[in-house]
Amino acid sequence: MRVDLFDFDLPEALIALRPVEPRDAARLLRVAPGHPLAEARVRDLPALLRPGDCLVFNDTRVIPARLRGLRARPDGSSVRVEAMLHRREGPDCWRAFARPGKRLREGDRIRFGSGRDGSACDLGHLDATVAARGEEGEITLAFDLAGAFLDEAVARLGELPLPPYIAGRRPADARDAADYQTVYAREPGAVAAPTAGLHFTPDLLARLGAAGIGEARLTLHVGAGTFLPVKAQDTEAHRMHAETGEITPGTAARLNRARAEGGRIVAVGTTSLRLLESAAEPDGTIRPFAGATDIFITPGYRFRAVDVLMTNFHLPRSTLFMLVSAFAGLETMRAAYAHAVAQGYRFYSYGDASLLFRAEGR
């Protein structure tokens, strides 16, 4: 499909720079094909879902994945390098998007320096070698540390990777360390938050449980590729970067049981949906999953695992707007987004949310 079909006008002022307080006070637009748009708040979810439905949360935890360092030149001078880690390849290896990526070569040594507070990790620095180069500034870094030692150094030296549309307008600060993390985050490894989950509070989770609405957890480590613009003119020419995830046998069994008993699978965020669809059999059965997925969902895709999707409002021409258009219908979503813009809904990672019901036959 032509990428320009997914374009729309979005005033920059509608891109949220901070979340609302409390988290569940965010606006929620209910979008059900064949029904009028309905406005609510995230805190109203217990009344918008049914007993027996099962919410699926992505419990990945955002790591401080932006590293700044220096590459030594042959003449003794140095060049500043910024690396955004996006996918772990092994105990000592990460794929990263680097700037200036085109000027780096295999074998180059990079020394990542002091931490955010000006202090150093125990060794004073973190060294890495450029092990491979990819496209669009992507490199593979082989670090001199591995495993938990590498994790500790990255946690000490790295910076929180706010999305570009926010980071371009203000720097990350101490408040983001809490705001850009779900209350149920558990498994470290993401470089972007599963942002639909940012709206949930312990109180809301308790009220959902009291209403007979179940919950399940999976893990998909969101990569920096989620921020990349679609440069192709046709969706068939766009390549998704792989992300790693896991659905345990217990989670798969819980979800299959919920559906067998008449409940709906409610994905909290596009990351949960993408992993569920990657793990689903043609008959809708969800199997355990451990590995990488690069699933790219556009209109025409037949959904197998997910009945309802809660997700934030996405940017024009993004793979995420393509996904929601596949789920609820392109014209339905264009109308919903036009309404959201006209009514001043807040967009993107810190913005408001929508509750989408899958269109018949999709």
Swiss-Prot record:
EC number(s) per entry: 2.4.99.17
Keyword Ribonucleoprotein attached: no
Keywords of this entry: Cytoplasm, Queuosine biosynthesis, S-adenosyl-L-methionine, Transferase
Pathway: tRNA modification; tRNA-queuosine biosynthesis
Subunit text: Monomer.
NCBIfam families: PRK00147.1 (NF001140), queA (TIGR00113)
Name of the protein in question: S-adenosylmethionine:tRNA ribosyltransferase-isomerase
Organism of derivation: Methylobacterium sp. (strain 4-46)
